[in-house]
């Protein structure tokens, strides 16, 4: 969708000034002394606004991507100037937020229902020209405004998309085209896949129109300055080129697309099912199946407009494709202009001779005449139907048409609705049509509807692109059908509002995705049935997938929760469901010719899009403003409506898996994993990755106690304290009272002194200027190496100097019980920057190791692998840590908002012998107390 945001903020005519000419520096003046006066006047160029920052942050959680673009500009001129922000976004993405800061005014985007009459500042325009429509598979978002003299402006754009699997890989593409060199340019991508990341690659920068089929390309490595940190389930990719590196790539600031490709591990044939807060998503991508035979007719436009390069490239591509056909396949070729020319009047078996003859036929095709799209499609469908009718019921195969044209129907039937109706009636759902449109004159809407209505896909090839390589790449996606007539069923008593569950074909390297709502959140199992046909037989897969809380993963996406009926924290699976449902409603609306039905679909799609803040053809964006800015916001660096911080989600695949999607620096053996945490009542978890052990303990404190969690004030300058709040114990519980973390305070002493106070409702940042951030709004602020990312009602991520990161979970209750309190959880996501002298209830273990020994009373089995133990009373053992012998017992503990279950060795009695000193030694006098404690003193003696 192409958006042109023309903000009527007082347009003015901008002319050059003496001050602008001087901004080019003394060297320009010295050069001017050597040239005549009239030439020197021409050199006094107008100073355009300077882009001081261009940054993109993207988080992919189980294929669902949240992306936020931040752009800051400065008007160095002495007069007001027009500025424009533009960003290419994937065509499949939905814009969810746009915010603009002009001087001291904030303009906040709001998604509303589209009205026929619009007097708003936001104007939308769709232009099908190559210049306006961006690169292949993208659309351009534009916003323009006037920036006052010597003032600043900032733009923040957020969008979401579900990554599609093609050729065995998910591809995430980010446009890096700031239009000028920027002193602060960065792309930061986090990938979290609980199934495990099987492969990951970063491609060289591309301009999309230069990209081809993907065969044998992209082997020159990632762009310069790219850093990749990866472990089993998490990857962080950072692209941060200097100005010099940017200039070497493109001096005009149009660097190209930053592309990441990856795939995930797959275990069960039934697929990967993830559940969260009453929503589920089912990823189905079976492998190791024999390919289905395919019956394919290649329909090639040979009208006069195809003369020259387009026809030559297409012929070369078909030569390659014919050699890829399998012996069990059957094929034919049709060329069409104002006449329909069929190579053979029946489908031909694949043999060396038939491939040779087909290539000869293609070679002799010559461009002439008009374009009879209807006649060509009818002839191709008749060929396929004739073969299927005579092949017998035992012949399981897939019938496909690959249709390529560069124009509109000009001969025969030219009425679009008639062509669509004729094709639909002839195909009868038995033939899938895959269309490719070349150039600017093609009727792409017709091709799109032909594919949508006939179980196919469509691709657009721009005029400057290599049509042949695009055809090969498109064919590669459909060259290997593995299943047909796929149906995935769930019990109606368990699942409602599921997305599409019927699929005509499944091609190797792709993926089927279904999402829906669970009727009962406490459901023990989700029954799944998959029926399909492959080359040999009819397949039925049935299984009950456990969805118990201890088997499910808890996610903290940080994306706003604008709708839905779930409780608790934000849910990326819910947003994935809303994304898929909206897409399917839009597709159904596009296919429908019945006006009442179209209106019903439009209303449903519109209501859902407004609820989840998706910008669609049925919604519009209005900028509300100006509104007051929060104190100190103007100087905050990196502010954005970021969606998707560091979450954790676990797949439901019939067996529990260990969470661990945390940052790992390459070539460094020590890993700081975010299981190291304090959460709940309060429950402490310490991970020892080198020993493959997790240890847990409780601290039974008193309301008002301030616990020192991390103490590294002297070295890294970081101190973290947590204040407890009391609550009554649940009925029939063994405790007299509960305590939770009410407030987390963080003191950073280097390089500049900053104070952070975090509660479930707000974040206070005091680093000279006091800044108050509400926790119900997503925002990112930063300065002096400190970044604070608030994800609405979900979590707060604090990053210090890029080497220390804490994630504070926000636990809110819609209707809290008497024993429940809004509270916080504290997780150490990255401890690389903390020193070896770090102490505190959690900090003292960050640089320690531990080992397990047998209990003196008798041997224990599988002590380092408690997952292998039988469920029941946990065995006891002795833990050796920091020279102490600590009795422990195996337990299971819930973390990440109480939904994910881990196995750990539990130390009783307020962690006696496990921690240095005793519990009272870790009590601080006030929230920002950094004074030396007994524990800290002992830590320096160890």
Swiss-Prot record:
GO molecular function per UniProt: serine-type endopeptidase inhibitor activity
Region (Disordered) location: 116-136, 208-227, 550-571
Tissues with expression: Abundantly expressed in placenta. Less abundant expression in mammary gland and ovary. Expression is barely detectable levels in all other tissues tested.
Signal peptide: 1-16
Chief site of localization: secreted
Induction and repression of expression: Down-regulated in breast tumors.
Ranges of residues in domain VIT: 35-161
Family label: Belongs to the ITIH family.
Function: May act as a tumor suppressor.
Protein name: Inter-alpha-trypsin inhibitor heavy chain H5
Annotated source species: Homo sapiens
């Amino acid at each position: 969708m192409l958006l042109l945001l023309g903000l009527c903020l007082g347009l003015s005519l901008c002319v050059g000034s003496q001050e602008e000419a001087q901004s080019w520096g003394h060297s320009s003046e010295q050069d001017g002394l050597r040239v005549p006066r009239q030439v020197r006047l021409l050199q006094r160029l107008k100073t355009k606004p300077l882009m001081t920052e261009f940054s993109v942050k993207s988080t992919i959680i189980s294929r669902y991507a949240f992306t936020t673009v931040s752009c800051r500009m400065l008007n160095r001129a002495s007069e007001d100037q027009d500025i424009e922000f533009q960003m290419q976004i994937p065509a499949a993405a939905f814009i969810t937020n746009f915010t603009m800061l002009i001087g001291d005014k904030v303009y906040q985007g709001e998604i509303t229902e589209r009205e026929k009459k619009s007097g708003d500042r936001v104007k939308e325009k769709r232009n099908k020209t190559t210049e306006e429509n961006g690169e292949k598979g993208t659309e351009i978002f534009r916003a323009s405004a006037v920036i006052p003299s010597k003032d600043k402006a900032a733009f923040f754009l957020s969008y979401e998309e579900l990554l599609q699997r093609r050729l065995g890989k998910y591809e995430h593409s980010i446009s890096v085209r700031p239009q000028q060199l920027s002193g602060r340019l960065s792309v930061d991508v986090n990938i979290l896949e609980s199934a495990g990341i099987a492969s990951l690659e970063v491609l060289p920068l591309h301009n999309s129109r230069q990209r081809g089929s993907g065969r044998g390309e992209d082997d020159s490595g990632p762009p310069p300055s790219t850093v990749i940190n990866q472990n089993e389930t998490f990857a962080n990719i950072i692209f941060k080129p200097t100005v010099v590196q940017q200039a070497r790539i493109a001096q005009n600031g149009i660097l190209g697309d930053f592309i990441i490709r990856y795939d995930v591990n797959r275990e069960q044939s039934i697929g990967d099912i993830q559940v969260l807060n009453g929503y589920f998503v089912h990823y189905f991508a079976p492998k190791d199946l024999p390919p289905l035979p395919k019956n394919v007719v290649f329909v090639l436009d040979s009208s006069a407009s195809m003369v020259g390069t387009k026809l030559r490239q297409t012929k070369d591509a078909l030569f390659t494709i014919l050699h890829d056909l399998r012996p069990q396949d059957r094929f034919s070729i049709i060329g069409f202009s104002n006449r329909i020319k069929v190579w053979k009047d029946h489908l031909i078996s694949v043999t060396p001779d038939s491939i040779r003859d087909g290539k000869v036929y293609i070679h002799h095709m010559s461009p002439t005449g008009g374009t009879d799209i209807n006649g060509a499609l009818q002839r191709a469908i008749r060929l396929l139907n004739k073969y299927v009718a005579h092949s017998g019921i035992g012949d399981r195969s897939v019938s496909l048409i690959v249709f390529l044209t560069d124009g509109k129907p000009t001969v025969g039937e030219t009425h679009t609705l008639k062509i669509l109706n004729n094709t639909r009636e002839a195909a009868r759902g038995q033939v899938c049509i895959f269309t490719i449109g070349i150039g600017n004159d093609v009727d792409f809407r017709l091709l799109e509807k032909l594919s949508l209505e006939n179980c196919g896909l469509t691709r657009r090839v721009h005029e400057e692109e290599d049509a042949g390589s695009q055809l090969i790449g498109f064919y590669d996606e459909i060259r290997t059908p593995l299943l047909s007539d796929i149906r995935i069923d769930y019990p109606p008593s368990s699942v409602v509002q599921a997305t599409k569950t019927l699929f005509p074909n499944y091609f190797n390297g792709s993926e089927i995705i279904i999402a829906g709502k669970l009727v009962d959140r406490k459901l023990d199992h989700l029954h799944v049935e998959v029926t399909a046909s492959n080359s040999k037989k009819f397949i039925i897969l049935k299984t009950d997938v456990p969805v118990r809380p201890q088997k499910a993963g808890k996610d903290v996406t940080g994306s706003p929760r604008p709708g839905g009926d779930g409780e608790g924290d934000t849910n990326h699976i819910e947003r994935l469901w809303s994304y898929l449902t909206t897409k399917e409603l839009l597709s159904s609306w596009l296919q429908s010719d019945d006006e009442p039905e179209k209106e019903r679909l439009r209303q449903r799609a519109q209501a859902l899009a407004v609820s989840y803040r998706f910008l669609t053809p049925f919604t519009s964006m209005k900028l509300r403003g100006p509104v007051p800015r929060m104190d100190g916001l103007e100087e905050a660096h990196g502010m954005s409506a970021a969606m998707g911080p560091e979450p954790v989600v676990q797949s439901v695949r019939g067996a529990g898996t260990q969470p661990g999607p945390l940052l790992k620096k390459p070539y460094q053996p020590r890993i700081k994993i975010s299981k190291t945490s304090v959460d709940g009542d309060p429950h402490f978890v310490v991970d020892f990755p080198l020993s493959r052990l997790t240890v847990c303990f409780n601290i039974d404190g008193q309301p008002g106690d301030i616990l020192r969690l991390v103490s590294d004030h002297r070295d890294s300058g970081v101190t973290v304290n947590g204040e407890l709040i009391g609550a009554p114990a649940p009925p029939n519980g063994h405790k007299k009272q509960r305590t939770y973390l009410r407030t987390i305070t963080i003191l950073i002493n280097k390089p500049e002194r900053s104070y952070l106070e975090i509660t479930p409702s707000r974040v206070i940042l005091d680093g000279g200027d006091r800044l108050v951030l509400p926790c119900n709004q997503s925002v990112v602020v930063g300065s002096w190496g400190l970044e604070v990312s608030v994800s609405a009602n979900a979590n707060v991520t604090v990053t210090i100097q890029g080497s220390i990161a804490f994630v504070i979970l926000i636990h809110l209750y819609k209707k809290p019980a008497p024993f429940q309190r809004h509270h916080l959880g504290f997780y150490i996501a990255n401890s690389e920057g903390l020193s070896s002298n770090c102490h505190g209830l959690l900090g003292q273990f960050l640089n320690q190791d531990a080992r397990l020994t047998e209990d003196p009373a008798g041997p224990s089995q599988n002590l380092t692998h408690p997952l292998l133990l039988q469920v029941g009373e946990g065995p006891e053992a002795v833990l050796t840590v920091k020279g102490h012998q600590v009795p422990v017992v195996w337990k299971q503990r819930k973390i990440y908002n109480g939904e994910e279950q881990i196995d750990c060795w539990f130390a009783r009695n307020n962690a006696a012998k496990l921690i240095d000193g005793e519990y009272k030694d870790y009590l601080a006098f006030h929230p920002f107390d950094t004074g030396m404690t007994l524990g800290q003193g002992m830590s320096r003696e160890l």
